């Protein structure tokens, strides 16, 4: 806490009181923002944890299917079957405003109207395990997109929470105490000046009265 270097005048006192009101209002708004950001951040962390578990399980399942398919199919046949994908996806990136933080939103646009039309090969020379691998990856793909959204959102919200926390602390521990200390000092100085002025006026009054009595 430090007193600001300002002149102890009534005008400065009025300015500082207005700044103190604004600082307190800003402090409350920033605390509310920080608390809401923390609430949304914790919800996203919970969702991120669950999504990661589901995605990792699905990828492990797809890897198991692919390992079996690779063991029963010739390498050339397997590579040919997967060479030309049946389904193509284009990601559209939008943004969502969360407490002045712009969170990316990934919207998949599929080439065909049927999202389940994923197999680009016939079944005569391929293993059913290959179907399982492709199906598992196709099923988990939307979750992978959502996981990317959530992880980026967590990163952006964490950065904003830290910025907001620093601003709250600066107001709470530096600016507001400095304003309060300076207002207290100026108020005290003005009171001292007022008492000094009153004392001087009383002395002048006494002198005038004494002089008036001496002329009688």
Regions found by a protein language model. Give the residues of each.
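Charge-rich amphipathic alpha-helical interaction elements
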Residues: 1-216
